[in-house]
Amino acid sequence: MNLHEYQAKKLFAEYGLPVSEGYACATPQEAAEAADKIGGTTWVVKCQVHAGGRGKAGGVKLAKSKDEIRAFAQNWLGKNLVTYQTDANGQPVTKILVESCTDIAKELYLGAVVDRGSRRVVFMASTEGGVDIEKIAHETPELIHKAAIDPLVGPQAYQARELAFKLGLVGDQIKQFTKIFMGLGQMFLDCDFALLEINPLVITAQGNLHCLDGKINIDANALYRQPKLREMHDPSQDDPREAHAAQWELNYVALDGNIGCMVNGAGLAMGTMDIVNLHGGSPANFLDVGGGATKERVTEAFKIILSDSKVQAVLVNIFGGIVRCDMIAEGIIGAVKEVGVKVPVVVRLEGNNAELGARKLADSGLNIIAATSLTDAAQQVVKAAEAK
């Protein structure tokens, strides 16, 4: 689960990290009033969406009057912001962050992720702040310095000092960096983060460290024990199809292709997408109906897949282990009738009661193409999609 920048900074402040005074505003009037609360003559206004690249897309502005703030809010609130990290539709802007302006002398990078290989939280720091860290990691990896935190021990001050020296910090900056590092490390463990990023962490004109931005992703599997963070979830940022799927305990991820996929089991779903690609097709989604597939869930799965206007054909690939293939066949027949599927549907059934399931599909009188193998299914669905 992602947090907005203003939510991340609120958490930073709770752990004693230096952040700008700011207010998340839902109306142009609130945004203008926030400038009065903050004071000063210059403010930064930022669209709050779960995506990077806001500045280049016009979603961040330096404002020198309340009229500019109000105009920025009027322009963006209720609209979608499209960045290089969003799809063509963009993300809806429901909040504008208005905060005080910071004089920047230098930009640094500080981030942390869970390294599953070492079973540690790995902090990364770089003198190249304010830019895409993936680009730095690819082109100049020597500029990224790391520190691994053992979750049983927690962050250590000596690790912070080592990173501070490598970043070229001096004097009181080392103490400030140590405080930030220790706070972030403890926050990461306390709040079950999967990713944390401050880009940039700046050195101000006065020589102090300041968290100018904040990005947080929380491990969704740990949300049951993070009720406070769970309340921060912003459903407006979710893909509507993914949100619909979650209500039915379906694992759905939208993609860019034109072949809808419905599979039971995540591994089989990934293998299905691979073989569709291998035969020249392009999957429109990842959808795992799981081991408890029922007629109702299959029906909802069809609805979700077909809500994507790009879908030209649907491939259903079911391995009957826990689930009986004849029951799945009944679900497919019922779903096709209820939803009124207009695109070709290719079905491959294998395993428990597969032959009985295939007979039910054949006797249904519906335009369902039965496949004899996974390769045959992929070839048939690619051919059907091209014919559309």
From Swiss-Prot:
GO terms for biological process: succinyl-CoA metabolic process; tricarboxylic acid cycle. ATP binds at K46, G53, R54, G55, E99, T102, E107. InterPro entries: ATP-grasp, ATP-grasp_succ-CoA_synth-type, ATP_grasp_subdomain_1, Succ-CoA_synthase_bsu_CS, SUCC_ACL_C, Succ_CoA_ligase-like_bsu, Succinyl-CoA_synth-like. Keywords: ATP-binding, Ligase, Magnesium, Metal-binding, Nucleotide-binding, Tricarboxylic acid cycle. Substrate binds at N264, G321, I322, V323. Heterotetramer of two alpha and two beta subunits. Succinyl-CoA synthetase functions in the citric acid cycle (TCA), coupling the hydrolysis of succinyl-CoA to the synthesis of either ATP or GTP and thus represents the only step of substrate-level phosphorylation in the TCA. The beta subunit provides nucleotide specificity of the enzyme and binds the substrate succinate, while the binding sites for coenzyme A and phosphate are found in the alpha subunit. Belongs to the succinate/malate CoA ligase beta subunit family. This is Succinate--CoA ligase [ADP-forming] subunit beta.
